[in-house]
């Protein structure tokens, strides 16, 4: 309700990082599992619970990795952009929104002969029905997070657009952390401090 809007606090964009090393990740995973099973009455999946700790360690990097990556030399004719091809249905209409916007950027980069473009959209089982529409924009390789970070830092510009359900994706926060030159479509949500067109973002 609108009368409660003044009480709402806008959150800053954020992204996942590796919080602990392997030993502490295992320790906290199982100690928190014991606490959860002891105090909750609801049934839950042990596999999903422990899987979150596994993904935190295997798929994310420590914050220090982002700080160190700021020193990577930028290649002035190189653009790297890798993103998710989200599944589409009658409610989210991602093929008319985020998927289409990302595809337009990818196609524009590929059409500019003086740009060395690398990347695309990564499909999943859920988004198979959209593959045909964006076949020319799909990326079929798997890369490590360290590689993604290095190539993103090497890119002379990065691209941002509101993601699933118009949320601020992790990439916006990662780009800001890395101090990248950001090209973006209009932001869909308020921020604690606005990003100003022509100052810290180009919309």
What positions do the PLM features span?
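Nucleotide-sugar donor-binding catalytic core of glycosyltransferases
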Residues: 1-169, 185-193
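Conserved donor-binding/catalytic loop of nucleotide-activated donor transferases
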Residues: 153-155, 176-180
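A short acidic/histidine/glycine-rich donor-binding loop in glycosyltransferase catalytic cores
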Residues: 198-203
């Amino acid at each position: 309700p609108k009368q409660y809007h003044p009480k709402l606090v806008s959150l800053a964009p954020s992204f996942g990082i590796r919080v602990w090393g392997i030993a502490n990740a295992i320790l906290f995973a199982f100690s928190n599992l014991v606490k959860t099973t002891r105090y909750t009455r609801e049934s839950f999946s042990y596999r999903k619970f422990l899987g979150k700790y596994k993904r935190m360690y295997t798929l994310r990097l420590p914050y220090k990795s982002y700080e160190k990556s700021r020193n990577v030399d930028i290649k002035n004719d190189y653009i790297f952009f890798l993103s998710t091809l989200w599944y589409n249905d009658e409610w989210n209409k991602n093929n008319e929104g985020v998927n289409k916007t990302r595809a337009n950027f990818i196609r524009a980069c590929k059409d500019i002969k003086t740009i060395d473009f690398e990347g695309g959209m990564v499909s999943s089982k859920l988004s198979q029905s959209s593959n045909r529409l964006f076949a020319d924009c799909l990326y079929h390789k798997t890369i490590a997070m360290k590689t993604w970070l290095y190539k993103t830092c090497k890119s002379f510009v990065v691209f941002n657009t509101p993601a699933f359900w118009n949320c601020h994706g992790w990439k916006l926060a990662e780009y800001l952390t890395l101090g990248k030159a950001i090209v973006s479509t209009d932001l869909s949500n308020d921020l604690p401090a606005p990003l100003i067109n022509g100052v810290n973002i180009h919309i």
